């Protein structure tokens, strides 16, 4: 199922009908079950301070930005990753109110939104590394300043516009040394189990008005996307590791 699908639970193409497996995402992070690992090897973010530009699209399911990559590719490595991974896109998940929206949950609770920075393996392109950032309500919304300026142009499905001078570093928390790590899947069809997940423990703030702009974005049926998060999946035999880089 990579064609038509929806987030509506009652829809015949809804989350209950999506592909499944033993290592699916998202998951609930139960702090009582997490293993802590201290290390000197943190994640390295390359060219995350360099401004990038590209197309941002309403694809009918989310708002997604695909960078126009030139010589200075945003990349990540270290922190337990098995290779260098290069950014290919980032997108957002949100809910119909400020009490829900994130895909991953923490102790069963959701943040109002979640950002996914999707990276593809340079050596083995069949693998992905997704960095998840919880977005919490606050007075400061610098992390979404670029998106805030253009979301009004993306209400209709399949619309595209340009964004300039995006600094990915502004979308990351101040503390990048503490994160949860587990092996999982894409959270949308085909739900392929090819993803190494990194979820920062520290959220980034966004404003209520910014979240409201996302809720005006429409799906392919011209209905506002009130929520676009997949229900949490069973952990099964997997472990969640809390990595702290000293």
Swiss-Prot record:
InterPro entries: CA_dom, CA_dom_sf, Carbonic_anhydrase_a-class, Carbonic_anhydrase_a-class_CS
Alpha-carbonic anhydrase domain: residues covered: 3-244
One annotated Gene Ontology cellular component of this protein: cytoplasm
PROSITE patterns according to UniProt: ALPHA_CA_1, ALPHA_CA_2
Coiled-coil annotated residue ranges, if any: none
Gene Ontology molecular-function annotations: carbonate dehydratase activity; zinc ion binding
Enzyme Commission numbers on file: 4.2.1.1
Entry annotated with the keyword Zinc: yes
Family: Belongs to the alpha-carbonic anhydrase family.
Protein name stated in the entry: Putative carbonic anhydrase 3
Lineage, broadest ranks: Eukaryota, Metazoa, Ecdysozoa, Nematoda, Chromadorea
């Amino acid at each position: 199922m990579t064609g038509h699908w929806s987030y509506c639970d009652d829809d015949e193409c809804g989350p209950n009908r999506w592909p499944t497996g033993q290592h699916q995402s998202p998951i609930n992070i139960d702090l009582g079950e997490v293993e802590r690992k201290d290390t000197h090897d943190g994640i390295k973010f390359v060219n995350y301070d360099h401004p990038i530009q590209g197309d941002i699209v309403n694809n009918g399911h989310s708002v997604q930005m695909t960078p126009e990559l030139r010589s200075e590719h945003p990349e990540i490595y270290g922190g337990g990753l098995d290779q260098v991974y290069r950014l290919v896109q980032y997108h957002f998940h949100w809910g119909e109110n400020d009490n829900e929206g994130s895909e991953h949950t923490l102790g069963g609770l959701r943040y109002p939104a979640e950002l996914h920075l999707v990276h593809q393996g340079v050596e083995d392109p069949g693998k992905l590394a997704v960095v998840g950032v919880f977005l919490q309500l606050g007075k400061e919304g610098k992390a979404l300043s670029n998106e805030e300026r253009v979301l009004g142009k993306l209400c209709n499905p399949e619309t595209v516009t340009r964004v300039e001078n995006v600094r990915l570093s502004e979308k990351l928390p101040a503390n990048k040394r503490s994160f949860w790590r587990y092996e999982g899947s894409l959270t949308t069809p085909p739900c392929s189990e090819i993803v190494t997940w990194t979820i920062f423990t520290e959220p980034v703030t966004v404003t209520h008005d910014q979240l409201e702009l996302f809720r005006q974005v429409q799906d392919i049926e011209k209905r506002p996307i009130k929520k676009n998060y997949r229900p949490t999946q069973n952990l099964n035999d997997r472990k969640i590791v809390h990595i702290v880089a000293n």
